[in-house]
Design a protein with these regions (language model features):
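Extended alpha-helical solenoid/arm regions of large eukaryotic scaffolding proteins
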Residues: 1-313
Length: 313
């Protein structure tokens, strides 16, 4: 019977095996660039506190030491085998085949969901994100390391959120870290004001106001110049509840948002857009310039003319 605790059996294809220098350098470079590898997180689950001390192994002796540390750890058998499977994927890569990892799959009866998950993490660690997402969104998987996966996909996206959104909408993970939530949310807000707005509503009640204010800030402060008018119009046209509208005005008129460019103008835009003309006219002293092709002084004159005697009613 196959014994995964035997180094000679796991690495029967070459008991003197080791990674070449280029592979070791790539692994170390990616660990630094991504602030940690996903295999590090799996290894830590076995009780090994410092994965970087063992991985990547720089020699055959290093491989034997790593194997011994995994086997003697307190991790579950399927976790230990999954780590060994991950190691074999790297040996498979130069051959263009799956001989080594397949042999371990068959010898240990490693469940398919663990194979799929480890392949996903392996591609993440190689920064092959498109391939990684294909594995990590497999319906057999329960989202694991979702916060970290999403943060990496966003930060390494180069402003293309296709993969991050595909992972989020397909895997439907429950994000738990504030860092991941805000990272993902700010990325959505840069892409679609409306999508970001509905994302705020999907969050716990206690965090909705903070995220709504983030959305307003991103739109007014971080939109490209050629898009700020359109994005501002999209913002003021959102179907806000009474509470959200109160947050909107409080943030832009009295809160931290009052320091943003066009903060008062944006409130005025919403009042006009929602037909609240009397309140719009009550906003004296804005003294603003135009946003896009809109000049608020001219608009005020137009509103007064349109309302006529109703202003005094």
């Amino acid at each position: 019977m196959f014994n995964y605790q035997s180094f000679a059996e796991v690495f029967a294809f070459d008991p003197e095996c080791s990674y070449d220098e280029e592979t070791v350098s790539m692994i170390e470079r990616n660990r630094k660039d991504m602030e940690g590898l996903f295999i590090d997180r799996v290894v830590k689950e076995t009780g090994i506190v410092r994965p970087a001390k063992h991985y990547p192994p720089k020699s055959n002796n290093g491989f034997r030491t790593l194997h011994k540390a995994i086997i003697e750890s307190s991790g579950a058998d399927h976790t230990k085998i999954s780590i060994l499977y991950y190691l074999l994927l790297t040996f498979d890569f130069p051959t263009g085949k799956r001989d080594y990892s397949l042999a371990l799959e068959q010898s240990t009866f490693l469940p398919q969901k663990y194979q799929i998950f480890m392949k996903g993490l392996w591609h993440m660690d190689r920064k092959e994100f498109e391939a990684a997402v294909q594995y990590l969104t497999h319906p057999s998987l329960i989202p694991t390391f979702a916060d970290e996966i999403l943060e990496v996909l966003v930060r390494k996206s180069k402003d293309d959120l296709t993969l991050a959104l595909a992972y989020y909408h397909t895997a439907q993970p429950t994000l738990t870290s504030r860092s991941a939530i805000e990272c993902f949310f700010s990325a959505i807000a840069r892409t679609s004001v409306t999508d970001a707005f509905y994302f705020t509503r999907s969050q716990p009640q206690h965090s909705q106001q903070h995220m709504f204010e983030m959305l307003v800030s991103v739109v007014l402060n971080n939109s490209p110049k050629d898009l700020v008018a359109d994005r501002s119009l999209e913002l003021v046209s959102l179907p806000l509840s009474l509470e959200e509208n109160a947050w909107f005005e409080e943030y832009l008129l009295y809160g931290d948002g009052r320091a943003l460019k066009k903060s008062k103008d944006t409130v005025l835009m919403r009042k006009i857009g929602t037909g609240n003309f009397i309140d719009a006219l009550s906003m004296r002293g804005i003294n603003s310039r135009s946003i896009g092709n809109l000049d608020w002084n001219n608009l005020s004159d137009g509103i007064k003319h349109g309302l006529g005697p109703r202003i005094d009613g």
